[in-house]
Amino acid sequence: QKPRRIPVLSVSSIIKKPTWLSDEEYGAILDGTYKNRGRGMTDLRYGIEINTAVFTKAHVNGFFTEYGQGLVGHENDFEGSVKGVAESGGLSVINHPGDWLESYVDVNHAHEKKNIELFADILKKYPSCLGIEAFNRIDTVTCADRILWDELLSAVIPSGRNVWGFANSDAHVLSDIDTSFMDFVLPDRTEQTVRRGMENGTFFSVGRRAVYELGKDFVGEGEYPTVTRITANEDEQSISIEGKNYNRVQWISNGKIIAEGEKIDLIAASQNIGCYVRAQLLGKGGICLTQAFVLDDGNMHEVTLRNITPQQRKIELAEDKFKSTRFYVLGQEISREIAYRKRRRQEKKK
């Protein structure tokens, strides 16, 4: 039986014809005789990308909820989807924020306090919004999303919660599969166990490509770097990593590499450490990110990103509302396309 499609996808299928499973393939999946890769698979029901059919790519992933199915999105509106998922009892993740920020064009967009504040406020307000994608597909439009993640960690952790970094192949086509994914550490593969793993951050995010960390021409192949053990030594004030398929380990805090090697001495590195540290393992197969380890010396305090008056904020909200109208956004997209084509022509002339 062919799946029910909402009208927008029905139109898109005219442009790009879908490839259906044959009756034999579908039957083999149902009776368990389909080709076996030797690994199990967990079907996470009720997962969907929300706030779609928008030009601005303000997408949110909803998990363990039916909220958002068939709903037409609103331009530049992350919070509406996050709120809807929260009220339905599900979990959410902010998708490819760099695609919305266009930080792949200008990395400074990932450092702008207004942009950081927007996502930080959502994360503080909705605990069910677990974090952002640190990797998406082949890391083109999301190459600065680790930079934004570090900014958010510094802004949000002092408020009392962590921000998980996710990875997603966003597989619209077969070639996207295995480009970005998460490596979970779980006692079993039940739906509820996966949910707890997402909530607790018991997973590592892997990317086959990482433009800033590995170079724009690098493509990971073969076995990817993985973490097999993490040891936090309270007496030594150190964290050590064990793993496989890597040739370098880097430690990051406040968006900067502060140490290298399988072990970090937190006291020796204290001058460069903020409220967290995270590790990344690099190898021939790509890059593997740990979640952030929160470091609290007792002096942690809430972060205020911008000091603006209520009147300034009111004006800003009115401007943002206007910039989220379809009329404005359509004009913006046309201008961006013209600028993009101009850049391409200039690059070809060089």
Region spans (language model):
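A metal-dependent hydrolase metal-coordination microenvironment
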Residues: 1-109, 127, 133-149, 166-172, ...
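Surface-exposed substrate-engagement region within the catalytic domains
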Residues: 120, 147-155, 184
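Cysteine protease catalytic core and zymogen-processing segment of caspase-like enzymes
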Residues: 22, 112-121
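C-terminal functional module detector
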Residues: 2, 156-165, 169-348
